[in-house]
A protein has these predicted regions:
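Short, C-terminally biased terminal segments at protein or domain edges
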Residues: 1-86
Length: 86
């Protein structure tokens, strides 16, 4: 169950970014990025839960947590930059 949720939220980030490439305007583009950001937060949650319940060890969790943090920061920067250009 947990791994299915992680897979769903993690792949949804990429799916929404792909959809953003074909957005019907800036508002739609930002919306897709904001959805991807929410999915990134959810992915971080599932990773933390898997780690805290002992399903994944720290040596697997830490790099994944760092990757999620980097993706989150990139998404936030992209959203803020796009909003500033409006």
């Amino acid at each position: 169950m947990l791994t299915n949720q992680l897979l769903r939220s993690g792949t949804s980030i990429g799916a929404n970014l792909h959809e953003a490439q074909y957005a019907q305007g800036t508002k739609d583009f930002i919306s897709k990025f904001e959805i991807a950001l929410k999915e990134c937060h959810e992915t971080e949650y599932w990773l933390e839960l898997l780690y805290e319940t002992g399903y994944i060890p720290a040596e697997q969790f830490k790099p994944l947590q760092n990757d999620c943090g980097a993706i989150r920061r990139m998404l936030i920067a992209s959203i803020n930059t796009t909003k500033a250009k409006q």
